[in-house]
């Protein structure tokens, strides 16, 4: 069992080395991983930090934890089950689950190929939430420049405005409804499925269920819903929702972009799996990103991480990463239930570039807090405007350089004297122009935005988050905070829909709003 961090000599050595390591990019550090280039030059680094990191990983039993992840051990130790998403994308899945995985892959491919041959389903509406939504939504948006076989729309929020907008102008006689829910009890996809089914019925579709597909780990619940066995695609309890893109949850990707695109996405992720599994620590991209993340959060005191993809096609990457990181690492309890003892998961936020520069980069450059930044950009574009792509890359590199280098007072004063003749006013202006610099960042360069490169990028973030969980001694595969809120919502909806019932065990504010909403006509 990993040692509580604050009391361990390995942690104290790591923290001391991180505090005293260079944060000014004195040594170039670029790692190649599964076709990506990851530049960690602007993160804290020294030989002492590398040595301390190796000792910390040994203390936290990292090699054993990683082996459990890939071998189907109880990596999700609070729920006593594997977190075996790596098996889903392996070319040769592990023997215990190979038959099930390959069987579902084959069923999915035959379903898509049959729909293609029949020219069926010009439109697809995917109903999920969280992990069953963000992954396929992000991938179909990111790769649609390669051409769409079908229009795929997504609705996730229980706010029915969302599903109403998604259904607008679709042909009910040529639309496939996908209901994606691991438990098949989740409120949002089932509520939206009811709306979609009524839409089909009201349009005169004779047998609406024939146009509905379920993706779930709870086959019995999908059967009870009325969906035919041939239209139920399965994944398993050992696949976490936020890691489920690699399962049948990838069906909308195959319907929109083709089965070959989905295969390439899986292959890219599998290539990153092999890099993470076999590459030594000092050249291991996900592991180095994790070590930087732990140092930034737990030693250097940064409370958040900004992710800025300089590619408008990656607009949904930020919320995907938000769920991955914050649902995985927003915890405090270690293996024995005691607190981790150091700050853990950061807030994750961001926006695509260059919009981000005109929204929050002022804060990143000159606020007293600041935040580490992940810059993501493609070397090659998929449009013919080469000059403008170079302009995009130049902006990305310039913002990163400014965060790293900063602008000292002497340089700012020279600039100020060029525009302000009064010496006192020039000195005042110079203080406004100072940039502290030394702010950490990572640059991730994709060769181009292909399915393979995107799969590698997503898997790299998954492994980075896993490694941070191991280093902090927390379980990155459960989500008890999410479950607690869902349980409270079930109680509140019963009280809202039964005005005569007693409102019990609610705090004063919640009780006030339940009473007020009951009085609405």
From Swiss-Prot:
UniProt pathway: Carbohydrate biosynthesis; gluconeogenesis; Carbohydrate degradation; glycolysis; D-glyceraldehyde 3-phosphate and glycerone phosphate from D-glucose: step 2/4
Keywords attached to this entry: Cytoplasm, Gluconeogenesis, Glycolysis, Isomerase
- Locations listed in the record: Cytoplasm
Give the GO biological process terms. Answer: gluconeogenesis; glucose 6-phosphate metabolic process; glycolytic process
Active-site residues (renumbered): 327, 358, 486
Main site of residence?
A: cytoplasm
What is this enzyme's catalytic activity, as reactions? alpha-D-glucose 6-phosphate = beta-D-fructose 6-phosphate
Functional summary from the UniProt entry: Catalyzes the reversible isomerization of glucose-6-phosphate to fructose-6-phosphate.
The UniProt entry's sequence similarity note says: Belongs to the GPI family.
What name does UniProt use for this protein?
A: Glucose-6-phosphate isomerase
Say which species the protein is native to.
Answer: Bordetella pertussis (strain Tohama I / ATCC BAA-589 / NCTC 13251)
């Amino acid at each position: 069992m990993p040692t509580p961090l604050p009391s361990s000599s390995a942690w104290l050595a790591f923290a001391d080395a991180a505090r005293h390591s260079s944060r000014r990019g004195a040594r170039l550090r670029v790692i190649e991983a599964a076709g990506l280039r990851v530049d960690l030059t602007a993160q804290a680094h020294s030989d002492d930090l590398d040595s301390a990191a190796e000792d910390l990983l040994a203390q936290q039993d990292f090699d054993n934890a990683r082996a459990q992840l890939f071998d189907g051990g109880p990596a999700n130790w609070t729920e006593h089950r594997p977190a075996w998403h790596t098996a889903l994308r392996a070319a040769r899945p592990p023997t215990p689950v190979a038959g099930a995985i390959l069987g579902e892959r084959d069923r999915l491919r035959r379903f898509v190929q049959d729909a293609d041959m029949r020219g069926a389903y010009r439109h697809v509406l995917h109903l999920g939430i969280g992990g069953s939504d963000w992954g396929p939504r992000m991938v179909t948006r990111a790769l649609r420049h390669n051409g769409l076989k079908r229009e795929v729309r997504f609705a996730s929020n229980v706010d029915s405005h969302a599903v109403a907008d998604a259904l607008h102008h679709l042909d009910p006689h040529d639309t496939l409804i996908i209901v994606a829910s691991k438990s098949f009890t989740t409120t949002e996809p089932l509520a939206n499925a009811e709306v979609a089914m009524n839409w089909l019925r009201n349009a005169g579709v004779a047998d609406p269920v024939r146009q509905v597909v379920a993706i779930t780990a709870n086959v019995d619940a999908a059967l009870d819903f009325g969906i035919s066995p041939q239209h139920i695609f399965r994944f398993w309890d050992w696949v976490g929702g936020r890691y489920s893109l690699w399962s049948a949850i990838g069906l909308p990707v195959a319907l929109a972009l083709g089965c070959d695109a989905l295969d390439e996405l899986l292959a890219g992720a599998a290539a990153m799996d092999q890099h993470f599994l076999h590459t030594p620590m000092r050249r291991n991209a996900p592991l180095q990103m994790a070590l930087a993340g732990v140092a930034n959060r737990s030693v250097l005191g940064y409370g958040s991480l900004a992710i800025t993809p300089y590619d408008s096609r990656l607009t949904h990457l930020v919320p995907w990463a938000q769920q991955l990181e914050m649902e995985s690492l927003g915890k405090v309890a270690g293996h024995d239930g005691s607190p981790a003892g150091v700050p853990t998961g950061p807030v994750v936020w961001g926006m695509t570039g260059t919009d981000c520069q005109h929204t929050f980069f002022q804060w990143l450059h000159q606020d007293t807090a600041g935040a580490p930044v992940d810059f993501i950009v493609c070397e090659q574009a998929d449009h013919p405007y080469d000059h403008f792509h170079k302009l995009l890359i130049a902006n990305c590199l310039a913002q990163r350089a400014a965060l790293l280098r900063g602008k000292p007072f002497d340089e700012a004063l020279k600039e100020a004297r060029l525009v302000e003749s009064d010496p006192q006013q020039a000195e005042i202006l110079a203080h406004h122009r100072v940039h502290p610099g030394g702010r950490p960042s990572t640059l991730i360069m994709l060769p181009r935005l292909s399915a393979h490169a995107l799969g590698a990028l997503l898997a790299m973030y998954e492994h980075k988050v896993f490694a941070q969980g191991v280093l902090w001694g927390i379980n990155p595969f459960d989500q008890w905070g999410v479950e607690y809120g869902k349980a409270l919502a079930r109680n509140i909806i019963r009280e809202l829909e039964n005005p005569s019932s007693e409102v019990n065990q609610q705090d004063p504010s919640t009780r006030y709003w339940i009473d007020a909403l009951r009085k609405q006509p």
